[in-house]
UniProtKB/Swiss-Prot annotation:
<keyword id="KW-0677">Repeat</keyword>
<dbReference type="Pfam" id="PF22493">
    <property type="entry name" value="PUF_NOP9"/>
</dbReference>
<comment type="function">
    <text>RNA-binding nucleolar protein required for pre-rRNA processing. Involved in production of 18S rRNA and assembly of small ribosomal subunit.</text>
</comment>
<keyword id="KW-0539">Nucleus</keyword>
<feature type="repeat" description="Pumilio 3">
    <location>
        <begin position="194"/>
        <end position="230"/>
    </location>
</feature>
<keyword id="KW-0698">rRNA processing</keyword>
<feature type="region of interest" description="Disordered">
    <location>
        <begin position="1"/>
        <end position="43"/>
    </location>
</feature>
<feature type="repeat" description="Pumilio 5">
    <location>
        <begin position="328"/>
        <end position="365"/>
    </location>
</feature>
<dbReference type="InterPro" id="IPR040000">
    <property type="entry name" value="NOP9"/>
</dbReference>
<dbReference type="InterPro" id="IPR016024">
    <property type="entry name" value="ARM-type_fold"/>
</dbReference>
<dbReference type="GO" id="GO:0032040">
    <property type="term" value="C:small-subunit processome"/>
</dbReference>
<dbReference type="InterPro" id="IPR011989">
    <property type="entry name" value="ARM-like"/>
</dbReference>
<protein>
    <recommendedName>
        <fullName>Nucleolar protein 9</fullName>
    </recommendedName>
</protein>
<comment type="similarity">
    <text>Belongs to the NOP9 family.</text>
</comment>
<feature type="compositionally biased region" description="Basic and acidic residues">
    <location>
        <begin position="9"/>
        <end position="33"/>
    </location>
</feature>
<dbReference type="GO" id="GO:0000056">
    <property type="term" value="P:ribosomal small subunit export from nucleus"/>
</dbReference>
<dbReference type="GO" id="GO:0003723">
    <property type="term" value="F:RNA binding"/>
</dbReference>
């Protein structure tokens, strides 16, 4: 057969173009950091799909069965489970590397690590020694390695706290059996030394970058977040979903920070130096907008202050705080403000405590202060930077941002396109933290956007349901669907937004009541049984505090709302969502004993159905229905106690103190947090000035100070 002729001219031209483009793009990086580039190429060549052998078919069946047994966890006692784990580890001895690189067996190894004892954990760690870099770059073993690192961090803290002398006898036994007896701290440092030559290559690797993030968190003594629930700094959204599907749950070592030895600070400093070595601004800015390397760089900026006063990573990306506007930096910041990865990087560096406030203020003053409104209109990028700045800048700058955005708030928010709902909530929080700054204007803008025909000062019963229709988008939602559709993420976001508005000001609660009355009763009852919209009904059932005094029209309106639940109490009590609403009606019907009695009568009328339901029994208990049925006088005494609590609780002096509203409690909490931040900042600043003065003193002044002359 004749050889196939490869296409020549077009391929050569395209290859030449790509080569020239790459050369021009990375010319600066190569000229300043040639050694680092060569090292990363060596890493890629040496870590091509590490292969430690195949698992035998018979072994695979055994380990697969063991994995399912551990997943079910149907052991009679912890001793039975420990014996089972011991036998599986005995069978897996010498095959650990094959198992962790196998898709099915890697899940088994992860479960074994989660349940392993301290001795077993050290033995597994010892088996991986010398292969950590290869395992970190593998699709399956990298997850096993992350779990091993978390358990190792917990064991290091345990060894630090407990006295080693009590373990000498046990260690001798281990040594006789040929097991690993070194302290976990030493084993961990050896592993870090394995990673050091390859750190720059790990930054951009799909799997090893996650291991590197976890390594940084452990060395810095930071909290190790969950891998399945919260917005984890360890895993991507896709990875968290996958872990939920394979049903691997975290143990008690996650969502915690661990005590670390002093040697870890040295290791963290060396790690940071290894990453930043031979790097220039161009290269670091490329990493900042790289979708894999960017989260690692965010973490390095967050922790570098622990070991580096010069903030090397920050100043490789941005200029020093004493320098003026720079055209290249301006172009880079503009890209961060308009790119999804870049905006997330800048938002994270602002939110985290790693970067100094003066660094953030410099970027704000030079590149963002004059175009707040323009950035707020970038609903997928720039607006998140603005939200982060609201809680980092000085009060004067925060008020400037509020002054720019509040007059245009109605134009910035778009419910139908799910744009800037978070901005509205953050503005409310910022307004509260500034002592309800421009509160009335915010309320006016929100009503202008969602209920332009609603008269806030003099609402009428003829009010339409436009407010909740515009906010929740009930038309076209899953409300009333008979196919058991799950509520969508958009419906949850809108629901949270409306709950925030009702918490912010009681005017929104009154408006929601009028909208409930304007809805068809069937539509309203459907909301009570909906997984998301039922929360709106529940949050709307709040009463004006007695200190403010409930006007008579509002009291009458409250009665009208209670009438909407007539003949629906039993069905709602037996529903997982509606039962919470019935519980809330106890407080909502305060000062209205007749309505309480009517609800109790409904529950008693079909008590058999209510008591058969799990949720119904809870409602029966919360409404004290046993007293209602058997001791009506005692039940009415509960109502009297509730009314007394509503008007205020008598203290020892005989005075009456009212219960504070949630917004007042939140303002007090924010004020306390602000006070603590200011105290910490002042303390840090005074310490820095004192050290700076000491450095600038001449030798004679230092001697005089030591002698006690300058007290």
């Amino acid at each position: 057969m004749a050889k196939t002729k490869s296409r020549g001219r077009r391929v050569e031209k395209s290859a030449d173009k790509l080569e020239k483009k790459a050369q021009s793009l990375f010319e600066d990086t190569k000229s300043t950091g040639e050694e680092g580039g060569d090292d990363s190429n060596e890493i890629d060549a040496s870590l091509k799909s590490p292969f430690f052998g195949l698992v035998d078919s018979n072994e695979l069946d055994y380990f697969k069965q063991a994995e399912s047994t551990l997943n079910v966890n149907a052991f009679d006692s912890d001793e039975d489970r420990e014996g089972f784990i011991r036998s599986v580890l005995e069978e897996a001895r010498g095959k650990e590397l094959k198992l962790v690189t196998n898709q099915i067996c890697s899940k088994l190894m992860e479960r074994l690590i989660l349940f392993a004892s301290d001795r077993q954990l050290k033995n597994i760690f010892g088996q991986f020694s010398g292969h950590f870099v290869a395992l970190a770059h593998h699709k399956y073993s990298s997850h096993v390695l992350e779990t091993l690192l978390v358990r190792s961090a917990a064991l290091i803290e345990k060894e630090l706290i407990h006295d080693d002398s009590s373990q000498n006898e046990e260690e001798r036994e281990e040594q006789e059996e040929g097991e690993v007896t070194d302290p976990m701290e030493g084993l961990f440092i050896k592993m870090v030394d394995e990673f050091k030559p390859h750190l720059q290559g790990m930054l951009e690797h799909q799997y090893s970058s996650h291991v590197l993030r976890l390594l940084i968190l452990i060395l810095a003594g930071k909290e190790l977040p969950s891998t399945t629930t919260s917005n984890s700094t360890l895993r991507s959204k896709k990875s968290k979903i996958a872990r939920k599907m394979i049903e691997i749950k975290d143990n008690q070592d996650f969502n915690k920070s661990f005590q670390t030895p002093s040697s870890f600070k040295i290791q963290l400093r060396e790690l940071c130096n290894s990453v930043s070595n031979n790097q220039n601004s161009k290269r670091m800015r490329e990493l900042a907008i790289h979708k894999i390397a960017s989260p690692v760089l965010q973490l390095l900026i967050q922790v570098e202050g622990l070991v580096d006063r010069d903030r090397t990573f920050w100043h490789l990306i941005f200029l020093k705080d004493s320098e003026d506007k720079n055209s290249q930096e301006e172009a880079f910041v503009e890209y961060l403000l308009s790119d999804s990865v870049g905006s997330h990087f800048l938002e994270a560096t602002i939110k985290n405590d790693g970067a100094r406030i003066k660094y953030i203020e410099r970027l704000y003053k030079l590149y963002m202060e004059d175009r707040i409104l323009k950035l707020a209109k970038r609903s997928t990028t720039g607006v998140y930077i603005i939200q982060a700045l609201l809680f980092k800048l000085k009060p004067v700058d925060v008020e400037h941002i509020l002054d720019e955005i509040i007059p245009e708030l109605s134009n910035l928010i778009s419910i139908s396109e799910n744009q800037n709902l978070d901005l509205g909530q953050r503005l409310i929080d910022a307004s509260i933290s500034r002592g309800n700054y421009r509160r009335d204007e915010i309320i006016e803008q929100l009503f202008l956007k969602f209920a332009p025909n609603y008269n806030v000062q003099d609402p009428q019963l003829k009010t339409t349901s436009e407010f909740i229709e515009n906010v929740l988008q009930l038309t076209g939602s899953t409300l009333g669907n008979t196919r058991d559709d799950w509520p969508t993420a958009e419906e949850r976001r809108r629901s949270f937004f409306l709950e925030k508005l009702m918490e912010y000001d009681y005017k929104f609660v009154i408006c929601v009541w009028y909208n409930f009355l304007a809805l068809p009763v069937e539509r309203f009852i459907q909301m009570c049984f909906h997984g998301v919209f039922s929360h709106i009904v529940e949050r709307a059932l709040v009463v004006i505090p007695s200190s403010e005094g409930e006007p008579k029209p509002v009291l009458i309106l409250r009665k009208r709302v209670l009438n909407l639940f007539k003949d629906q109490i039993v069905n709602m009590s037996c529903n997982s969502y509606g039962s919470h609403i019935v519980d809330a009606l106890w407080n909502f019907s305060v000062l209205l004993p007749m309505y309480k009695d009517r609800i109790g009568t409904e529950l008693q009328g079909d008590s058999h159905k209510v008591k058969e339901s799990t949720y119904g029994r809870l409602v029966w208990k919360n409404w004290s229905m046993e007293l209602f049925v058997r001791k009506k006088y005692d039940w009415k005494s509960l109502i009297k106690q509730q009314e007394q609590a509503y008007y205020g609780v008598n203290d020892e002096n005989g005075t009456t103190s009212r219960v504070k509203k949630p917004i007042e409690l939140k303002m007090e909490k924010l004020a306390e947090e602000r006070r603590l931040r200011e105290e910490a900042a002042a303390k840090s600043e005074s310490g820095y000035k004192r050290r700076h003065e000491d450095d600038n003193e001449d030798d004679y002044a230092k001697k005089q100070k030591l002698r006690g002359r300058r007290r």
